[in-house]
């Protein structure tokens, strides 16, 4: 059984994340979504909320592809998480050159720690390349409409936190 690990904070999960999840699920029999517990980032949504959002969003992808998709919180080294879940590959999404530079360093370190686990990069689809959870939260916080970047369920969660989008007087 081929097991892949797609790690991230997913605060919140975006259409870009879901695109990578959908495409990664065709490469493996089981896709583990590693939900990072990163206390330094100060997430907007709790770990439980992020896991629940991912489980809800991934159910349809799992049904569509036949791939088992599970959310798995982790707080240890990524390579240790990969070992813990039996992953033979770590899947990473790339949006831009800046992502590649960071990921290139991570691959080098992870290979030194365990060279039996490969890293597979999937380029974000063009329509998702600008999407970042950090920017989605900022748009929502400032009263903008996040509809183009997240699913309706995630949008509702953001509206619960920040209120509905404000109408721009210039429109």
UniProtKB/Swiss-Prot annotation:
Keywords: ATP-binding, Coenzyme A biosynthesis, Cytoplasm, Magnesium, Nucleotide-binding, Nucleotidyltransferase, Transferase
The keyword Transferase appears for this protein: yes
Pathway: Cofactor biosynthesis; coenzyme A biosynthesis; CoA from (R)-pantothenate: step 4/5
Pfam families: CTP_transf_like
Site annotation Transition state stabilizer: residues: 17
Localization in the cell: Cytoplasm
CDD domains referenced in this protein's UniProt entry, alphabetically: PPAT (cd02163)
Enzyme class: transferase
Reaction catalysed by this enzyme: (R)-4'-phosphopantetheine + ATP + H(+) = 3'-dephospho-CoA + diphosphate
SUPFAM superfamilies per UniProt: Nucleotidylyl transferase
GO terms for biological process, alphabetical: coenzyme A biosynthetic process
Required cofactor names: Mg(2+)
Disulfide-bonded cysteines: none
Binding locations of substrate: 9, 41, 78, 92
Database matches in NCBIfam families: coaD_prev_kdtB, cyt_tran_rel
Similarity comment text for this entry: Belongs to the bacterial CoaD family.
Protein name, as recorded: Phosphopantetheine adenylyltransferase
Annotated source species: Dinoroseobacter shibae (strain DSM 16493 / NCIMB 14021 / DFL 12)
High-level lineage: Bacteria, Pseudomonadati, Pseudomonadota, Alphaproteobacteria, Rhodobacterales
């Amino acid at each position: 059984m081929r097991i892949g690990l797609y790690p991230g904070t997913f605060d919140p999960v975006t259409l870009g994340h879901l695109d990578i999840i959908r495409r990664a699920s065709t490469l493996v029999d089981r896709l583990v979504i590693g939900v990072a517990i990163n206390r330094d980032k100060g997430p907007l949504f709790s770990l439980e909320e992020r896991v629940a959002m991912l489980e809800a969003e991934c159910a349809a992808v799992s049904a569509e592809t036949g791939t088992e998709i599970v959310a798995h919180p982790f707080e240890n080294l990524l390579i240790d998480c990969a070992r813990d879940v039996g992953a033979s590959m770590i899947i990473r999404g790339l949006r831009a050159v800046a992502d590649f530079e960071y990921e290139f360093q991570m691959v080098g370190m992870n290979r030194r720690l365990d060279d039996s686990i490969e890293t597979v990069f999937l380029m974000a689809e063009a329509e998702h390349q600008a999407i970042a959870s950090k920017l989605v939260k900022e748009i929502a916080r400032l009263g903008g409409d996040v509809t183009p970047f997240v699913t309706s369920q995630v949008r509702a969660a953001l509206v619960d936190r920040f209120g509905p989008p404000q109408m721009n007087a210039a429109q």
